[in-house]
Amino acid sequence: MVIFLSFIKRYINEFVEAGSDIITFHPEADDNPEEIIKMISDAEIKAGIAIHPDVNIANIDHLFSKVQQIIVMTVTPGFGGQKFMHEQVQKIKDLDEIRKNNNYNYEIAVDGGVNNENAKICKDNGADVLAVGSYLLSQNQNNYYEIINSLR
C-alpha cells in the first residue's frame, strides 16, 4: 500500500488493523517522516518510502537505514498510464549503490510506466520489484503468465 495523504499519522492504525504488511508513504507528506516510520515499525509492519520524481535522494538519505522498501516513482503520481521517466533510472542505480555500500536491507521498487521496453533497464540498475499495472492491463491478451515473463 502506497499512501500519499496529508496527516498520514491518523490513518496508520487503521491500515495496520486492516492487515497491511507494509505501509509506504511519501516522506514529504509529513514534517516528521522518522516518526511515521517508527509508528509503522512499532506496529511490526514493514515501512517504506516512495520517492517523487522531483525529490533529490540526498535530502532523504537519513531515512534509508530505517525502511524495508523504497519505491522510485518513475511518473508524477496521480493517475495511471503515464510515460516512464527515464531520468529516474539514475535514482534506482544510486539507491542500489547506497544499499550495497551501507549494507542496507531495503528493496527497491519501481512504479510508473514500467513496461517490456524498460523493465530490464530497471532490473539491471538494481530494482527488485516492478509495478506493472497499466502495462499488464493494456495488453490484448489474457495470458498474464506470458506477459509477466516478458518482463523478466
Please place each PLM-identified region on the residue numbering:
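Catalytic cores of alpha/beta
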Residues: 9-17, 55-67, 112-130
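Expand to "…catalyze enediolate/carbanion chemistry for C-C bond making/breaking, isomerization
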Residues: 31, 35, 103, 115, ...
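Active-site beta-loop-alpha junctions enriched in small/polar residues
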Residues: 2-6, 28, 52-54, 75, ...
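C-terminal helical cap(s) of enzyme catalytic domains, especially alpha/beta-barrels
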Residues: 40, 123, 135-152
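Active-site phosphate/pyrophosphate- and oxyanion-stabilizing loops and adjacent acidic/basic residues
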Residues: 93, 120, 149
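Conserved anion-binding
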Residues: 10-11, 20-107
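Conserved active-site loop/cleft motifs that coordinate metal ions or position small ligands
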Residues: 107-109, 130-133
